[in-house]
Amino acid sequence: MKRTYQPSVTRRKRTHGFRVRMKTAGGRKVINARRAKGRKRLAI
């Protein structure tokens, strides 16, 4: 059986990247929440 996680850098960046997060209000909320929490990595 094939596993569900088949890593791809392109897909990873396109769906969870910083620029994608900044496009929507919800995404910006995520970034701000991670900033407030003090996360080292805000987005992938």
Curated annotation (Swiss-Prot):
One Pfam family per UniProt: Ribosomal_L34
GO BP terms: translation
Keyword terms of this UniProt record: Ribonucleoprotein, Ribosomal protein
UniProt GO MF annotations: structural constituent of ribosome
A single Gene Ontology CC term: ribosome
Entries under PANTHER family matching the protein: LARGE RIBOSOMAL SUBUNIT PROTEIN BL34M, MITOCHONDRIAL RIBOSOMAL PROTEIN 34 FAMILY MEMBER
Family, as annotated: Belongs to the bacterial ribosomal protein bL34 family.
Name assigned to this protein: Large ribosomal subunit protein bL34
Gene behind this protein: rpmH
